[in-house]
């Protein structure tokens, strides 16, 4: 920590979502539901932070309701349907240290899109395992892209850098310098 205070400051990109600036991750599917509700559950002593999120995931899965999500880029719909994971990343990690933005870089000028479409309940543990192993990209239902701007339309609450925001339409664009 002390050494970091003497390092030269580096410029980073931001994601601008309407009038909200995002340094790390904007998410809006089951991943957002967990992030928005993790603090409503009692922490289990001696359980690492990442596993606290897994604990909440297991408790919330039966209560989760899917919401249609539409993602548009350059006037073309790139996704329309239900999602389990919907993360627009500038940084690589979210909630408890999970690596969601595998190719995200705060200085590359792109938003790193990471989606997992609705999956059968029998595959949930497999995808949790992939996420814990930082290999979500190995899942057949995983979608990835890198874009400079994208529009999101969702009826689910959105989580931006740990804060909860209302459902709706969000125009996301990368802001540099």
Each model region followed by its residue ranges:
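ATP/nucleoside-binding phosphotransfer catalytic cores, i.e., glycine-rich phosphate-binding loops
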Residues: 73-75, 80, 105, 115-177
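Short acidic/glycine-rich loop or secondary-structure boundary segments that cap or lie
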Residues: 31-34, 79-81, 93-97, 121-124
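Glycine-rich phosphate/pyrophosphate-binding beta-alpha loops
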Residues: 31, 87-101, 164
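Short linear motifs in intrinsically disordered
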Residues: 2-11, 55-64, 103, 139-151, ...
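A generic structural signal for short beta-strands and their flanking turns/coil linkers
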Residues: 65-67, 82-84, 107-111, 146-148
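Catalytic core of DAGKc-family lipid kinases
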Residues: 1-84
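Gly/Ser/Thr-rich active-site loops/lids in small-molecule metabolic enzymes
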Residues: 43-52, 102-122
């Amino acid at each position: 920590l002390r050494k970091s205070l003497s390092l030269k400051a580096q410029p980073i990109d931001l994601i601008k979502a309407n009038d909200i600036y995002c340094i790390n991750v904007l998410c809006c599917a089951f991943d957002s539901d967990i992030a928005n509700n993790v603090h409503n559950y009692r922490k289990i002593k001696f359980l690492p932070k990442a596993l606290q999120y897994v604990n909440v995931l297991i408790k919330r899965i039966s209560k989760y309701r899917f919401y249609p999500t539409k993602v548009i880029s350059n006037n073309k719909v790139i996704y329309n349907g239900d999602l389990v994971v919907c993360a627009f990343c500038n940084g690589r990690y979210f909630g408890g240290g999970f690596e969601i933005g595998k190719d995200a870089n705060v200085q590359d000028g792109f938003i790193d899109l990471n989606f997992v479409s609705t999956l059968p309940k029998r595959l949930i543990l497999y995808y949790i395992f992939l996420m814990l192993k930082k290999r979500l990209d190995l899942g057949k239902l995983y979608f990835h892209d890198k874009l400079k701007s994208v529009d999101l339309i969702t009826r689910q609450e959105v989580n931006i850098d740990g804060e909860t925001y209302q459902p709706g339409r969000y125009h996301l664009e990368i802001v540099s310098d």
